[in-house]
Amino acid sequence: MHNNYDPIARYYDVLSRLVFFRAQVRAQIEQLAFIPAGSTILIAGGGTGWILEEIARIHPSGLRITYVEISAKMLDLSKKRDVKGNQVSYIHAAAEDFGISTVYDVIITAFLFDNFRAEKISLVFGRFHQALESGGLWLFSDFYYNPASGKRWQWYLLKTMYLFFKQISEVEASDLINTEHCFTAALYRPLKTAYYYGGFIKSIVYQKS
């Protein structure tokens, strides 16, 4: 199965911190203050679920969360998290496949789109866009590379990552595709943009018009 992190589920967070220290964690945590109380939230590709506990620190109750993860082992780890009084529905499915039956106030996609080729980015973005309330928030974070920056180390690191994860997790993408054009075309407004790890990680809080 493409983009499935089952083989390294137990070690994924450790690997992330070994390479990126806490940059991936900070990119996500520093967006969470934007989540309104009582929100319905879609988290797609949430990994081991540590984000659920961070959300619960801010909102210990009142949230309804749909947690979608393609890796069964990641999902099992997520179910063990302390979500306090929040209601979480765990769904074992790919982001492009699960049936969306709810309109959400907040969508969270952290390091999800870097797994996809261009056609799947368009597919997943379109589905999630339709599922987000007008005025809703999309908390986006992912790797970022601008060739004009002259930071060749980022290019080499990207190639190494894709080679590794293609072997381990059958990641379908071979190159990082910038997704900002999707949000721009759909008239999203960026409320906050932040960079981490020397600009290699970018997080944006978008608001749907």
Predicted segments with their positions:
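Class I SAM-dependent methyltransferase Rossmann-like catalytic core
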Residues: 1-23
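Conserved alpha-helix/loop element of class I SAM-dependent methyltransferases that forms part
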Residues: 21-37
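Class I SAM-dependent methyltransferase SAM/SAH-binding core
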Residues: 42-97
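A short acidic, Gly/Pro-enriched loop at the edge of an enzyme's catalytic core
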Residues: 96-107
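A short SAM/SAH-binding and catalytic strip from SAM-dependent methyltransferases
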Residues: 105-120
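A short glycine-rich, Lys/Arg-flanked "PGG" loop and its adjoining helix->strand segment in the class I
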Residues: 122-134
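C-terminal alpha-helical "lid/dimerization" subdomain adjacent to the S-adenosyl-L-methionine
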Residues: 141-186, 193-194
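Core SAM-dependent methyltransferase catalytic element
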Residues: 186-189, 194-209
